[in-house]
């Protein structure tokens, strides 16, 4: 039989689903795409490696129909990536919140899924959608092994001093209110890739990863283990993000609620969906638009970019303190990989670490590159993240 494995990686949102089929041997993507507007009207985007995107509008009342369409597309005689669905050897699912129950990836059994369900109240937007995707796959591919890869798992090595909030301790005991962190799969992948790229010994290193996308977080990785990260119980803590506020004085919530006559859901909606660089700039949550407005001298766009970069720099400084030093800083995700003027702003605050930016190499987009000068005391680099590949690797390791 075939030695290599084809792994279907699925990331289920509340009304969308992203997928990639990866050959685990060559690590090449055989096909990828997404389903959008599930439960509304439905649209499938499918792209076989080396071919054009195909877009199909079709009703998808639930995730089950969406996944059925993905499977149909994957073994379509014309543009399919496999001849038969039996060539899909395993499925890797992204699960957003594993709480304290999951410190690493696991094979999904009924027992495990019951535990995942217990984490639902910690991530009411994401986890139920992740579970629906898993159940739909089980129905459609009953004999294929499935693995859950948790966004929170990598951060489970944080010490108590880093994860406990200054709140009544009973909230932690009763409800597990504590800091969890997210993007763990990316932070783990990038910290390993960074050590490899720079020829550092991961087990004897201090690495700070800045995952800067529409959601953004920084992590401190000491000897290969996460010791702190900027997101908290939910992804709302920490950096200023695309539409999320990040750290604020909690009393602002009461103040705004009274002034604007909002209930708690209304205030949360503002903090999650209307804040961040979009709220500050009034332009966009997309840094391509922000950069254009910044270059035109739009004062609010300038504020948004300055506030964003300053907050990242402060967190990097905090994590140098947390690890009592740093060997390397890695930028990743959409903004981290592509937006050179933001990287330049962030690095401009780090001169005290003996870091100098190499303006030439900082102009790169989306490739591994060292962007600090050879005489910098700390190496700063860009390392593209690949969460799907990371999920594929985790899946293979457990299913083999």
Predicted regions, residues:
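Short beta-strand-loop/turn "lid" adjacent to the catalytic site in phosphate-handling enzymes
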Residues: 74-126, 147, 153-162
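Extreme N-terminal starter segment of soluble prokaryotic enzymes
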Residues: 4-8
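Internal helix-turn-beta structural module
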Residues: 302, 306-327, 336-400
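Catalytic phosphate/nucleotide-handling subdomain of diverse soluble enzymes
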Residues: 222, 228-263, 269, 333-364
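Phosphate/pyrophosphate-binding loops at sites that engage ATP/ADP/AMP, CoA/4′-phosphopantetheine
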Residues: 73-89, 194-201, 316-327
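Glycine-rich phosphate-binding loop of actin/hexokinase-like ATP-binding domains
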Residues: 154-257
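Short glycine-rich, Thr/Ser-proximal phosphate-binding strand/loop in the N-terminal lobe
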Residues: 16-60, 232
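Adenine-nucleotide phosphate-binding core of ATP-dependent small-molecule kinases
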Residues: 269, 276-280, 287-322
């Amino acid at each position: 039989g075939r030695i290599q494995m084809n792994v279907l990686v699925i990331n289920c949102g509340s009304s969308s689903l992203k997928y990639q089929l990866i050959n685990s041997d060559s690590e090449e993507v055989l096909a990828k795409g997404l389903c959008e507007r599930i439960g509304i009207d439905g649209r499938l985007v499918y792209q076989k490696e080396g071919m054009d995107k195909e877009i199909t509008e079709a009703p998808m009342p639930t995730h089950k129909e969406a996944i059925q369409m993905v499977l149909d597309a994957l073994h379509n005689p014309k543009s399919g990536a496999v001849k038969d669905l039996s060539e899909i050897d395993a499925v890797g699912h992204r699960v957003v919140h594993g709480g304290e129950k999951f410190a690493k990836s696991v094979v999904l059994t009924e027992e495990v899924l019951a535990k995942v369900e217990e984490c639902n109240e910690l991530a009411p937007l994401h986890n139920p959608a992740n579970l629906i995707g898993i159940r739909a796959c089980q129905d459609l591919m009953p004999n294929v092994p499935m693995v859950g890869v948790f966004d929170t798992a990598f951060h489970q090595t944080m010490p108590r001093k880093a994860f406990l909030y200054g709140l009544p301790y009973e909230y932690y005991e009763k409800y597990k209110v504590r800091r969890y962190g997210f993007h763990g799969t990316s932070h783990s992948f990038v910290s390993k890739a960074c050590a490899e790229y720079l020829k550092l010994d991961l087990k004897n290193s201090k690495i700070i990863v800045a995952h800067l996308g529409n959601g953004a977080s920084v992590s401190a990785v000491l000897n290969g283990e996460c010791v702190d990260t900027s997101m908290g119980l939910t992804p709302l803590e920490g950096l200023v993000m695309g539409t999320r506020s990040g750290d604020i004085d909690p009393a602002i919530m009461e103040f705004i609620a009274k002034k604007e006559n909002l209930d708690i859901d209304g205030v949360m909606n503002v903090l999650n969906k209307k804040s961040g660089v979009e709220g500050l700039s009034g332009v966009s949550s997309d840094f391509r638009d922000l950069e254009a407005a910044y270059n035109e001298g739009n004062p609010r766009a300038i504020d948004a970019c300055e506030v964003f970069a300053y907050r990242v720099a402060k967190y990097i400084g905090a994590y140098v303190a947390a690890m009592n030093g740093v060997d390397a800083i890695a930028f990743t995700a959409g903004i981290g990989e592509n937006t050179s003027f933001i990287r330049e702003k962030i690095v401009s605050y780090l001169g005290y670490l003996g870091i100098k930016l190499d303006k030439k190499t900082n102009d790169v987009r989306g490739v591994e590159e060292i962007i600090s000068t050879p005489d910098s005391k700390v190496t700063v680099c860009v390392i593209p993240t690949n969460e799907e590949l990371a999920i594929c690797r985790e899946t293979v390791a457990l299913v083999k």
